[in-house]
Amino acid sequence: MTARGRFITLEGVDGAGKSTHAAWLADALRDMGRTVVATREPGGTPLGETLRGLVLSESMTLDTETLLMFAARCEHLTQVIEPALARGDWVVCDRYTDATYAYQGGGRQLGADRIAVLEQWMRPALQPDRTWLFDVPLELARARLADARLPDRFEREEAAFFERTRAAYLARAQAHPGRIRIVDSSRPVTEVRAQLHAELQALAEMP
């Protein structure tokens, strides 16, 4: 019987630097001999990418936004994540359900209980084996975004939105200390990757 793969997620506010490290993490796992599926949310499937485009660019109600996030996630789980884990592959995903609790729950102030209903309806048992939360002072995150591409609908939000989002992320980390590890991504890239590599090796050696 094929051993189940491992599910890794990367989280953080826009500008925290998580996407910078996602491809590196996947390559590090491949160097350890693991087969890796690198993916992202919202997205990861043709339908998911279409929904991503809508969510990031079109004006909509908060309920619609949240439901579209979970619609994309349901397709992603069914078509990509669950089959990969069943094959014994490792999945590295740029954002997952923690992002919904942070952005819609914290940033947009939707009640966490409403998000929990959708999470329980979908796949309550499937949680990441490890989540790295890339945390950075918001001034630095916004400075990084200023040098990036044309900002999307979320990246154009006011500072208070990101303060609430960051606070919600840190609350998630406090509530799930066994799964979520905080990474101070204001440090140099070499220091961040040294931490990630050490923790990744420990995870890879776990039975």
UniProtKB/Swiss-Prot annotation:
Its EC number is 2.7.4.9. One of its GO terms (biological process) is dTTP biosynthetic process. The keyword Transcription regulation does not apply. Pfam families: Thymidylate_kin. InterPro entries: P-loop_NTPase (IPR027417), Thymidylate_kin-like_dom (IPR039430), Thymidylate_kinase (IPR018094). Keywords: ATP-binding, Kinase, Nucleotide biosynthesis, Nucleotide-binding, Transferase. GO terms for molecular function: ATP binding; dTMP kinase activity. It catalyses: dTMP + ATP = dTDP + ADP. GO terms for cellular component: cytosol. It is an enzyme of class 2 (transferase). ATP binds at G12, V13, D14, G15, A16, G17, K18, S19. HAMAP family: Thymidylate_kinase. Belongs to the thymidylate kinase family. Phosphorylation of dTMP to form dTDP in both de novo and salvage pathways of dTTP synthesis. This is Thymidylate kinase. The lineage of its organism: Bacteria, Pseudomonadati, Pseudomonadota, Betaproteobacteria, Burkholderiales. The gene is tmk.
